[in-house]
Regions:
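Flexible, glycine-/basic-rich loop-and-beta segments that form/coincide
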Residues: 237, 242-282
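Conserved S-adenosyl-L-methionine
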Residues: 98-106
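Conserved class I S-adenosyl-L-methionine
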Residues: 81-91, 99
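A short glycine-rich, Lys/Arg-flanked "PGG" loop and its adjoining helix->strand segment in the class I
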Residues: 160-177
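Short, glycine-/aromatic-enriched active-site segment of Class I SAM-dependent methyltransferases
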Residues: 182-199
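S-adenosyl-L-methionine
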Residues: 105-161
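Residues at the N-terminus of the alpha-helix immediately C-terminal to the conserved SAM/SAH-binding loop
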Residues: 91-96, 113
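A basic, amphipathic helix-loop patch mediating RNA/tRNA/ribosome contacts
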Residues: 1-50
Length: 282
């Protein structure tokens, strides 16, 4: 039996809207068709396989990743206008596109691939492309002076394995906003059980805890975490993490203990469950 969800929640789950607020606005404006018919209520229940079309202007960003970062910058209140950024795992440029639209001064777009960056992003004079570069082996000299912000959207590698490189190009007090993908963080056996899809909330919880702990072990402070409003292209739940690189003025917690991030983990997992299951019908 298929799961039925509210239309606004289903639009977000499918990546057709970056947030439920935007989904509700699209529905109210008469831009959403369900099964070829105009949908008028965001509370309408729809099946997971039901055809849905959003009419109107094209996507805001060159890839779905842009909407993920946009939601994180809003939630975490990270101001990027005028800053220098290193975008790790730039790919087609979804994160970079979001940053450019928000007024960054410079982006160093790093990716292990070649020629993937969308021409709209790669053609912007504020973007310096660094292709064929494994982020794990990133030379800090690539950035010149340390950057103010590092963003990361990486696949087929654990974020924990590249944290040294990412923090190595970030100035003290600078921010890291990274996409956490459980399918690339959990063990192979765990991922294989779900045929590449990680659905167990306890695995999400473990993954977030391990990534946050790895950041803290490198002197960073965890500032926030959230469930991505859009799943990965394969349907996997993803998370966004905000950390700040420590500096000489940072002080340890009581008795030298690291800050307790369990509350952030619990909140992010609960948010992800809400996105996956949707609100309960009355």
């Amino acid at each position: 039996m298929s799961t039925r969800r509210r239309l606004d929640a289903e639009l977000v789950r499918r990546g057709l809207a970056p947030s439920r607020t935007q989904a509700q606005q699209d529905i109210s404006a008469g831009r959403v068709l369900v099964g070829g018919s105009l949908a008028l209520k965001p509370t309408r229940l729809v099946d997971a396989g039901e055809p849905i079309v959003v009419q109107g202007p094209g996507p805001r960003f060159v890839s779905r990743a842009g909407a993920k970062l946009d939601a994180a910058l809003e939630r975490f209140d990270v101001a990027v206008a005028g800053v220098r950024v290193l975008d790790a795992g730039a790919s087609t440029g979804g994160f970079s596109d979001c940053l450019l639209q928000r007024g960054v001064a410079e982006i160093i777009a790093v990716d292990v691939g070649y020629g993937q960056l969308h021409e709209r992003v790669g053609g912007d004079p504020r973007v310096r492309v660094v292709d064929r570069t494994n982020v794990r082996d990133l030379d800090p000299a690539v950035a010149g002076d340390p950057v103010d912000l590092v963003t990361a959207d990486l696949s087929f590698i654990s974020l924990r394995l590249v944290l040294d490189a990412l923090f190595g190009v970030l100035r003290p007090g600078g921010a890291l906003v990274a996409l956490v993908k459980p399918q690339f963080e959990a063990g192979r056996q765990v991922v294989a059980r779900g045929r590449g899809i990680v659905t167990d909330p306890e695995v999400w919880r473990t993954v977030l805890d391990e990534v946050m702990s790895a950041c803290e072990e490198r002197g960073a402070t965890i500032m926030g975490a959230m469930a991505s409003p859009i799943t990965g292209t394969d349907g996997n739940v993803e998370f966004l993490l905000h950390a700040r690189r420590g500096d000489a003025t940072d002080q340890p917690g009581p008795d030298g203990a690291a800050p307790d991030h369990r509350g952030l983990v619990d909140a992010a997992v609960a948010e992800a469950l809400g996105l996956v299951t949707g609100p309960q019908a009355p």
